[in-house]
Amino acid sequence: MADQVEEKKRIKTVKDLSGVGQAVLNKLTEAGYSTLESIAVASPQDLSTAAGIPITTAQRIIKEARDALDIRFKTALEIEQERASVKKITTGSQALDGLLGGGIETRTMTELFGEFGSGKTQICHQVSVNVQLPPERGGLSGKALYIDTEGTFRTERIKAMASALGLEPKEVLQNIMSIRAINTDHQIAIVEELQDIIAKDNSIKLVVVDSITSHFRAEYSGRENLAVRQQKLNRHLHQLVRLAEIYDLAVIVTNQVMARPDMFYGDPTVAVGGHTLYHVPGIRVQIKKSRGNRRIARMVDAPHLPEGEVVFSITNTGIRDAEE
């Protein structure tokens, strides 16, 4: 039994499946079987034909993929036990942590959406620092990967936040790996490479994409490009969610908003990305400007958390509770 559990943990990608060498891997990839999920739902005949392998080998590969993904019915008690091991990263504000059920969760995607200057990037910077704190201080003693699509990542801000927490700024910077994504294809390619990077360094506990939609929105404008954009965005988001689930890490994505001219009452802004982005993130939080350095966070959607609003502040030292 222990050997089966260990084998399940070892299988992370298609190339980890027994009997899948480089030649078979190349054939599977060319035929569209590049993920464990695609293999798990394939028929033995299709897989055998695509990779040029015997039916019995295809059956074994499919079974291994299904076992690795733990595709089976589970009791509610098993699911509760799995949920109990989910970890949280503090945001720096007790009020915001409370809204999130204790902080930014691992094994899921948290979306922060709001207008320009609302504080989304500030939260991303803060959590990239806080993930490095020990568990007793609200962190995971881990590292962060930061995908910057808008050129807003600032080391000066990271150092100020680190110093405020009594951390060595240079060490904190060393534990944050950042890359500037220059367009949609580059952004997608970066995420596709993340699995290899994270598999080699299990101390990575946070992935940030700031922002998830800016390149998609700029490059796929117009109704005629909407279907292609949504398909690419959907696949991109699911790759990130899969990383969160496999490697027990937190994923934060930020998103822009746009005005709806048909709204005559209430908040006229909605998140960019349509239904694709409404359904994929496990937790969706809207960030709004308030007076001065205060911001309002509103829980929009989470299956296990109630709707609500809290106020927090963006200070010189980082994200903090709002002073009364």
Swiss-Prot record:
InterPro entries assigned to the protein according to its UniProt record, in alphabetical order: AAA+_ATPase, DNA_recomb/repair_Rad51_C, DNA_recomb/repair_RadA, DNA_recomb/repair_RecA-like, DNA_repair_Rad51/TF_NusA_a-hlx, P-loop_NTPase, RecA_ATP-bd, RecA_monomer-monomer_interface
Keyword set, alphabetical order: ATP-binding, DNA damage, DNA recombination, DNA-binding, Nucleotide-binding
Recorded superkingdom: Archaea
Binding site for ATP: 114-121
Pfam families: HHH_5, Rad51
Signal peptide residues on this chain, from the entry's feature table: none
CDD domains reported in the protein's UniProt record: archRadA
Molecular function in Gene Ontology: ATP binding; ATP hydrolysis activity; ATP-dependent DNA damage sensor activity; damaged DNA binding
Function text: Involved in DNA repair and in homologous recombination. Binds and assemble on single-stranded DNA to form a nucleoprotein filament. Hydrolyzes ATP in a ssDNA-dependent manner and promotes DNA strand exchange between homologous DNA molecules.
Family recorded in the similarity comment: Belongs to the eukaryotic RecA-like protein family.
HAMAP family: RadA_arch
Name by which UniProt lists this protein: DNA repair and recombination protein RadA
Native organism: Metallosphaera sedula (strain ATCC 51363 / DSM 5348 / JCM 9185 / NBRC 15509 / TH2)
